[in-house]
Amino acid sequence: MSKIGPEVGDVRTSRRTFSGNGVTVESYTAMPVVPVVDGGAQMPLQSPALILIHEWWGVTPHIEDIARRYAGEGFIVIAPDLYDGVTTTDAGEAGRLMSELSLEKGLAYLQVVLAELRTWPNVAAIGVTGFCMGGTFALRLACAAKLDAAVPFYGDIPEDTGFIAGLSCPLLFIGGEKDAWITTDKMGRLAAALEQYSQPGEVKIYAGASHAFFNDTRPEVYSPADAADAWQTVIDFMKRKLLPEGA
């Protein structure tokens, strides 16, 4: 089921519902506009797709903006709502929502979206990215399902990193040196696990950057120069990993 939204530049947005295995997931989608119609929405042929996972605030206008930016770069983007329609600007409420979302439930939602994307004949390859809580889920999904690329932004890394042995794709982890939550020690733990399990991954740490430095709606932590560099780095990485050779 889909509800088609307006075109913004060369991007079409919609809100779509995906179901499977007893799970129903509402999602915000954005994709390049081309004259090919499939399932009620316009989609490009043989394009890379991204699952974009939100921060602990929910699917906010900031996440929708990121989805449109990716679509403007040629990606089909699905931003699944792990909070079933709830958003907040209150950190206490966000913390409660995040704590009530189990890893198992979040991954079940994401697996439904991934299964849906795999049925779209126009999808060439699938990557995942996410921020904060979404970065945690992006990392976990890349270790629990077959994907083609993963870029978690400042997601959590637990002490037990054994799950990294299941990493299915090239990984680019992005963090900030001054992040008080996802510390350099945690990121070092991830780098060590990637080496231990001989997994294809890189940890990129921005000097002086804080947690959520990419979020331009939060001036207290936003770092414009680092965000711009991270954006171009991620676009280049995703295109290298998700586009066919010579595309």
Task: List where the protein language model places each region.
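Serine-hydrolase catalytic machinery in alpha/beta-hydrolase-like enzymes
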Residues: S2, P6-G9, S14-T119, F213-N215
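Short alpha-helix in the alpha/beta-hydrolase fold that links the catalytic acid
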Residues: I66, T183-L194, E202
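Active-site loop/turn elements of alpha/beta-hydrolase fold enzymes
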Residues: F75, L82, G155, Y206-G208
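Primarily recognizes the serine-hydrolase "nucleophile elbow" in alpha/beta-hydrolase
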Residues: Q111-S168
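Short beta-strand/loop motif that positions the catalytic acidic residue
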Residues: L167, F173-G175, D179
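Acidic catalytic loop of the alpha/beta-hydrolase fold
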Residues: K178-I182, Y197
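C-terminal catalytic histidine-bearing segment of alpha/beta-hydrolase fold enzymes
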Residues: Y197-A247
